[in-house]
Structures are given as C-alpha cells and as structure tokens.
Amino acid sequence: MTTTNFEEYDDPILYDKENDAYLLEIPLLLKWAAEKQGPIIDLACGTGRVTIPLAKNGLEMIGVDLHRGMLNEARNKSELLGLPIEWIEQDCTKLSLVTKSNLIYSVGNSFQHFLTNKAQDELLTSVNNHLELGGVFIFDTRFPSVEELLQPANEEYWKSYTDLEPQQTVDVFTISNYDSLDQVQHYTTIRKYKNENGQIINEKRTNIRLRYVFPKEMERLLHAHGFEILHLYKDWEETPITNDSYEMVYVCKKMREHSA
C-alpha cells in the first residue's frame, strides 16, 4: 500500500460515517481468537473499525496502518473508550514489530491496495515473519467476477445514506475502468450532497486503484509464502465459495518460515 493511493481515506470522519456500521467480520475473528493466545495484529487497521470491537471483547490488540490520519482517529476513539490498544504507524510491506502473533488479520479488502506482485510478496513475507509457526492469517479480497471487473465506465448510482452532521442526503456514484494487464480497477467515487429540498449543494470526487487476484493465482501465491489455505469462503458467514461470489475470505495457516 502506498501513500499515492490514499484519496478515499483522506477524511477519516467520512470513512467512519460510511463504514462503522459494517461489523460482519467480528464473529469469525472472535471464533479464531478464542483458539489463539497472545496479541492479535490488525493490518491496515484504518480507524479501528474492527480493532476496537475486538478489544471491547477483552482481546489484546495491535493496530497497524500507514495512514497517519486514520490511525490518529483510531487512537482518539480507543482513548475515549479507555481501551489499551497499541497503534503503530508502519508500512505493512515492511513490518518491523517487536511482537509475533498467533493471529494476524486484514479486513475491508485491504489486500487489494497492494497493487503489484512485488507489494503482494512483501506483504505476505511481512505477515509470515510476524506469525508464529502454526499461526493463522485471515483476510478478504473482492472476487474477480465478470460482473465485478466489467463495471460500466460511465457514472453509475451505487447507494445513498444520510449524513446526520449536518443533516444531508448523500448520493454515491462510481465510475470504473479495469486494466486487464495490471489486473487493477481504477475507481472514481462521486458523492453528491443534497439539502432538505433535494438540491445538490456539494460534490466530492475521490480516486482509488484496487488489484484483483484470481483464486488459483492466490492459491499459488499463499503457498509460495509458506501458507496453507484452511478455508476459503464467499463471505464472513463462512459460506462456501461459488462462481457468483462477491468476495473471498481466506483463513490461512503458517506452515513454514519464509524470507524474501
């Protein structure tokens, strides 16, 4: 993940408004946390959307992210709640933590922010280096279906929500363009803010690039970095993967040491 792909995360408050209610990962992570002792590492933790709920369950948490603004917001939230979470500003591809863990996870499809083969290799090497032998790595990434990759290149409606501060309706649209050679989707997100009369009073655009990995490609990638795939699901409810999946949730076990 690089600081040149951060536009979508430049406003941590907006990120929380749009994503804080999503907590589907928690049950599966709690299930695996119950089997593992010691601190748990949340890679690309953002504002602590998942880190904080797990800490509320009494787990020892370490959150790592490269984005200082997101990390500061996470720290502010955990301090208000009196939660002793360790927040660390580091690049996940160059991890240098004093702690090794039996459970590392990354949620929110953060794996897709590692755009090149080199970045993916460095990330998985970092994870391997900070996992105990037999430790578990859990992460998700969007499924590269035809529908997902061939989204229209024109402006398309996605969703609407209400921003309570101030009281505004926000209509969200997307434009996407898939680069088949690099397996990278270029997204533009357009947020149109409306007043109580339905008039558009503001518009914001952000850009982001996301790398897609195919299942067989991921299988070989994980094996090459010392991991065995224990489970592959289509969602966080542990539903078996199918051809019409929207995402892939991997539960992997470290089988051997790996160095770059």
PLM regions and their residue ranges:
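Conserved class I S-adenosyl-L-methionine
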Residues: 1-38
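Class I SAM-dependent methyltransferase "Motif I" SAM/SAH-binding loop
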Residues: 44-48
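Class I SAM-dependent methyltransferase SAM/SAH-binding core
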Residues: 51-94
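A short acidic, Gly/Pro-enriched loop at the edge of an enzyme's catalytic core
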Residues: 96-103
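A short glycine-rich, Lys/Arg-flanked "PGG" loop and its adjoining helix->strand segment in the class I
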Residues: 121-133
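Conserved beta-strand signature within the Rossmann-like core of class I S-adenosyl-L-methionine
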Residues: 134-141
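SAM-dependent methyltransferase
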Residues: 141-216
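C-terminal lobe and adjacent flexible extensions of AdoMet/dcAdoMet transferase-like proteins
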Residues: 209-260
